[in-house]
Structure formats: structure tokens, C-alpha cells
Amino acid sequence: MQYEFKDMLINGTEFNKGSSREVLQYAIGGMLYMPATRTKIVQDVIEQKNPDMKSICLDLEDSIGDDTVEEALILLKSTLSKLYTAMEEDKLSVDNLPLIFIRVRNPEQLRTLKNTLSQEQLGIITGFNFPKFDSSNTAEYIRAFNELQHKSLTKLYFNPILVDVNNYVEREMD
């Protein structure tokens, strides 16, 4: 069944991370980026501090310094584990969980996440944002994502963030 964006807006289509791709492509909406080092993410989600917040991105790239990457990875794992526990303890339902994306720095960091995140932690995530995405790194991002998807028990998605849209479109049109 195809959903049209207009119908979703008018009818207020319900969705969660398990919804179809046709729904999720529109449901992401305005994504709230926050550093993965932020310590109140779990509390804010459980308490529904921002009930209209439908998607968030835990940022491992621009919002954190190079010297805090390891700390951010540790906090990211903790955040995902706490959200999983909250769902197991019925403090949070999949319908109240925002769509959670992780913005990685590069394909290698995606592989690091594949090797360090548990299946439970991966189950909380909806997908990943790939920054500075262009023809020079497309294949590597896709390979790393496919490796991670193979480990996950749930469907994951990715959002490429294009470096230079005009240049990319012109190249693809030729």
C-alpha cells in the first residue's frame, strides 16, 4: 500500500520504527540532532518531554570534538541499553520511541558500531545518517551498512547527507 505525504498530514498516520519504508520516508520529518554525549536523552524520551519529537539523531560527528569520540561511543551504547531496558520494563513502548538515527563520522565508524553494539542496542535504532556522502565513499558506506544490517535482527535504514547536491545531481544526470 502506497502512502501519500498529503494523506499522512491530513489523516495523522500513526507510525513507529517497525512501520513500512513507505511510511517512514515521510514520518522522519524534522529531525532533532543532539550530541551522543548528551546524558539526558533517555530521561527526556521516557518522560515524553517533547511529545511531538518524532525523530532524533544521536550525533557522533560535528557536534562532538575529535577528543570525545570514545566517550561518545560509550555514552551512545549506554543510552541505547537504557532505552532497551525501559522498553523491557514497560516504561516505554515502541509507539513512544522516536525514530532514532545515528550520525557516524565515516564508514569505518559504522564498522566499529557493528562490532560493539549488541543486537538489543541495534533494535532500538531506526537507522544511520551518512555525512559528506558522495561518489568517493558511496560504495564503502553501503558495504559497511550491509555488514551491520546483517548483524541486526531488525530492518535498518540510512540517510545519505550529500556534500554538494548540485555537483552530485549533475554527475548522476550525465
Predicted regions mapped to residue ranges:
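Conserved alpha/beta-domain cores
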Residues: 2-18, 22-174
